[in-house]
Curated annotation (Swiss-Prot):
PANTHER family reported in the protein's UniProt record: FATTY ACID/PHOSPHOLIPID SYNTHESIS PROTEIN PLSX (PTHR30100), PHOSPHATE ACYLTRANSFERASE (PTHR30100:SF1)
Reaction it catalyzes: a fatty acyl-[ACP] + phosphate = an acyl phosphate + holo-[ACP]
Pathway: Lipid metabolism; phospholipid metabolism
EC number: 2.3.1.274
Quaternary organization: Homodimer. Probably interacts with PlsY.
Name the UniProt record assigns to this protein: Phosphate acyltransferase
Subcellular location: Cytoplasm
Organism: Nitrosomonas europaea (strain ATCC 19718 / CIP 103999 / KCTC 2705 / NBRC 14298)
Top-level enzyme category: transferase
Keywords: Cytoplasm, Lipid biosynthesis, Lipid metabolism, Phospholipid biosynthesis, Phospholipid metabolism, Transferase
Length: 348
């Protein structure tokens, strides 16, 4: 299956210096993926010249003369940057020239511009950011990670549907389990929105595990973890900070004395294996679900390996038919809910 992906070459902390070589290398390893490099032609051409690569049938340039700054307000970018590399790349999906877009640019601007250009899938009120996090047993998908700070119970249900569909489409895992992130497992725990969301999940026909707590994320208790964007973003950033702290502690201990340095040399193979297992770069690429097109947000500081992982994520979603499957599942589950849902139950 031939796939064409549009790359926002100007986005991110490193811009074309990372995005262009990463896209070219990915294309060389996947003979069924075509690349459109979107951005300032003269800048992209310099990067291609350095790689000794020329545009061809599988690699082409598409000009865009504006760049969305990493700290630019989303509304300003949407209103004033109509020829930005980000917006032009998204327009390529809308026109049918590409099936996916990858950007390491301004997250808020990408959210706003994606929603404006592509619109949401029927039955989806708001798009959500989904990321993969490592767990004891493998990995889990968590959404939302910051696109929606204030959510209704219906929004959380939609996130669950999209997350479960993503897992089943990309990983060929039927009936993935869904957990609702809460302050406790009991039904009486949580605010009214979370309680109502739990009722909706139970009536949906989805494989709803129930309420889960923060530690369940990394235990791998469920395949999908659902929460609002405020909770999800705090959980993600806390996890990143904890990982940095533990790595710092480990370095300090191994440098503390000559003996600890020698111990570090002996333990080096184990340490390297551990690093590979928890390497966050392999999970780079947040899926912006709920749009009429595949959009992947790469981390702004991603290196070449991490950006290639984001491209791979986009290709997997297209090949798995994630967009089509979400549309079908939304319609099916909406019919189920209309037929089966009971009146809200008051929990004292």
């Amino acid at each position: 299956m031939n796939i064409t992906v549009a790359i926002d070459c100007m986005g991110g902390d490193h811009g074309p210096h990372i995005t262009v070589p990463s896209a070219v290398e990915y294309m060389h390893h996947d003979c069924e993926t075509n690349i459109i490099l979107v951005g300032k032609p003269e800048v992209i051409s310099r990067e291609l010249d350095a790689l000794k690569v020329s545009p061809g049938s599988r690699l082409r340039l598409h000009p865009a003369n504006e760049v969305v700054g990493m700290d630019e307000h989303p509304a300003v970018a949407l209103r004033n940057k109509k020829d930005s590399s980000m917006r032009v790349a998204l327009n390529l999906i809308k026109s049918g020239e590409a099936q996916a877009c990858i950007s390491a640019g301004n997250t808020g601007a990408l959210l706003a511009t994606s929603r404006f250009v592509l619109k949401t899938i029927p039955g989806i009120d708001r798009p959500a950011l989904a990321v993969i996090l490592p767990t004891i047993s493998g990995h889990t998908y968590v959404l939302d990670l910051g696109a929606n700070v204030n959510c209704t119970a219906e929004h959380l249900l939609q996130f669950g549907i999209m997350g479960a569909t993503l897992v089943s489409s990309v990983e060929n895992k039927p009936n993935p389990s869904i957990g609702l992130l809460n302050v406790g497992e009991e039904d009486i725990k949580g605010n009214d929105v979370v309680k109502r969301a739990a009722e909706l999940f139970r009536s949906s026909g989805l494989n709803f595990y129930g309420n889960i707590e923060g530690d369940d994320i990394y235990r791998g208790t469920t395949n999908v973890v659902v929460c609002d964007g405020f909770v999800g973003n705090v959980a993600l950033k806390t996890s990143e900070g904890l990982a940095q702290m533990l790595a710092s502690y480990l370095r300090e201990e191994f440098r503390r004395s000559l003996f600890s340095r020698l111990a570090g040399l002996v333990a080096l193979p184990v340490i390297n294996a551990f690093r590979r297992r928890v390497d966050h770069r392999q999970y780079n690429g947040a899926s912006l679900l709920g749009l009429r097109g595949v959009v992947i947000k790469s981390h702004g500081s991603a290196d070449s390996y991490a950006f290639r992982c984001a491209i791979r994520r986009a290709v997997e979603e297209v090949r798995g038919g994630t967009l089509r499957n979400i549309v079908e599942h939304i319609e099916t589950l909406r019919n189920n809910i209309e037929q089966n849902i009971a009146q809200p139950v008051s929990i004292e």
